Amino acid sequence: MLSREIIEKTEVFLKRKFDAADYLNAHPEAKAYRIEHTYRVANIGRELALKEGFDETEMVIACLLHDVSYCEEFGEKGWIEHGRRAAHIARPFLSELGLAEDRINDICYGIAIHVDEKADFPGERTPFALSVGAADNIDRFDVFRIHETLTHDGFSSMGIDQKLEYCKKHLARLHKLIDEPMGTKTADEMWKARLSFQISFYEKLVRQFESRGLTRSMSKKGCSPDN
């Protein structure tokens, strides 16, 4: 059962950290994105917890705090270290909540390894710990991320040939990633479903662009595509 009181305390802690962050305050769009991403990951984590039998509250806490280190200025290695930094920031707060030490360590270990699967303290790669990173990864491939990625990469301003090459590169990457293990059966299923959707999307784009290329070729030869 979800403890609303503990979740609310975690939200207050996270908000306080983000509100005090110079970088996030100077870049409101980055702050809004980080908050939205955090809550999406928390919702995915809760779904994983319900289906895999994890403690809902602990999983939601872990997901809410997985990127809390964005309250700090990132140095040269800031991004690669942000999981480990988040774990260190979260640990004292989790102790204040009165959680058992073994549960604190499991939560912190999951947070620490969610970027590059490495921690700077002892821990186990339990299904619970792995699910923090799984929830984060699953969110990276939701439907809206397609729009965000295409917009960020300037897809609309590309020519047809560039778009075709772009889509093929994305397809190659998606096919490579789809069999990556996510730590639990539920996470594996969610991961494959999301990547399969994106694969279908990009395959349709490829067919459309290849069809346009064929149409242009026929036009140059004086043919009509209706013939």
Provide a role label for each language-model segment.
Residues M1-E5, H27-F54, L65, K118-N227:
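Divalent metal-dependent phosphate-bond-processing catalytic cores, especially two-metal-ion Mg2+/Mn2+ enzymes
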Residues S3-L24, H37:
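Short alpha-helical hairpin
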Residues I6-F13, F54-C63:
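Short coil-to-beta-strand
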Residues Y23-P28, C71-E72:
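A short, mixed-charge helix-start or loop-turn motif at secondary-structure junctions
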Residues V41, E81-E96:
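An active-site-proximal "capping" alpha-helix that borders the catalytic cofactor pocket
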Residues E56-G78, H82, A86, I107-E117:
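His-Asp-centered metal-binding catalytic motifs of divalent-metal-dependent phosphohydrolases/nucleases
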Residues E96-E101, T151:
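Inter-helical turn/loop segments and adjacent helix faces that build the functional surface
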